[in-house]
UniProtKB/Swiss-Prot annotation:
Name of the molecule in the record: Gene 18 protein
InterPro entries (UniProt xref): Herpes_UL79 (IPR004290)
Highest classification ranks of the organism: Viruses, Duplodnaviria, Heunggongvirae, Peploviricota, Herviviricetes
Domain of life: Viruses
Family annotation (Pfam families): Herpes_UL79 (PF03049)
Membership in a protein family: Belongs to the herpesviridae UL79 family.
Organism name: Equine herpesvirus 2 (strain 86/87)
Length: 257
């Protein structure tokens, strides 16, 4: 058992197990081995793709059969449309194509029939956000007729922006405390969704007793308490510069919100 509410699932390698306990202890990323840093970075990239596709699938179901642009665009910040516009211009789309409704419809039909074009546009947008790895989108998500609305709705989500923060500021010493904080939760979430950690049936009751904290936070606290692992203690003066934290809220300046 890893905790009162957490038990082992799929077998994990000794390296992953060692990294798990390092994460729970809050060990500085500076003390990770090169292999552990590469693996953690890989997990961040994979979890970004995973979270993006899960959220896209949720939006696909929620917006199914909806053709009202006002409804579809209710959660899309204007900045996203600017990035999409810039991406279209980079791909050779002219203002004439975008200025007439009939041409826009034909352009979208062409994009929707060519998955590679939408993948390129998606990666252009994520690259502009600082996420430079190849972002892959499942075929059932990217071929949806409302894909651009769905993409614009989910990119500002907290989980994606938190993972993106880790990827954008990876390797910057002044940002290490926050990168470590976010990446530790992403890593434990990875262990849960991959089946390495399984939760007991009483987990919901325990979460309610703790004031409905996040699932990952409750799991980490339970594992630390069960094994007597001391959690991270942030010494004074370790906080990263505030300008980097602004990245998390880059889409929060929409007056409509």
């Amino acid at each position: 058992m890893f905790g009162k509410l957490v038990r082992p699932g799929r077998p994990m390698s000794s390296g992953v197990r060692e990294l798990m306990w390092r994460v729970l202890r809050g060990t500085s990323l500076n003390n990770y081995s090169a292999a552990q840093l590469r693996f953690m970075h890989l997990i961040l990239c994979k979890m970004y793709n995973y979270a993006l596709n899960v959220l896209l699938f949720r939006e696909t179901l929620a917006n199914c059969a909806c053709r009202d642009d006002c409804v579809l665009g209710r959660k899309v910040p204007p900045e996203i449309w600017r990035l999409v516009y810039d991406g279209c211009k980079e791909m050779g789309v002219t203002d004439e194509m975008l200025g007439e409704e009939r041409r826009r419809a034909q352009l979208w039909m062409h994009f929707n029939a060519n998955r590679a074009l939408l993948e390129g546009l998606t990666n252009y947008v994520t690259h502009r956000l600082g996420v430079t790895h190849a972002v892959s989108v499942c075929s059932n998500n990217i071929t949806d007729g409302n894909y651009l609305f769905n993409l614009g709705s989910v990119l500002p989500s907290r989980i994606l922006m938190s993972i993106a923060y880790c990827l954008v500021f990876w390797g910057r010493q002044e940002c290490e405390p926050w990168v470590r904080h976010f990446s530790s939760k992403v890593f434990i979430l990875y262990l849960m969704v991959s089946g390495h950690l399984r939760l007991e049936g009483s987990f919901a009751d325990a979460s309610a007793a703790c004031g409905y904290q996040g699932v990952v936070e409750v799991v980490m606290r339970d594992m630390r308490g069960y094994r007597g692992v001391e959690g991270p203690v942030a010494p004074g003066g370790e906080a990263p510069p505030t300008d980097t934290l602004d990245y998390l809220f880059v889409f929060n300046n929409n007056v409509l919100f």
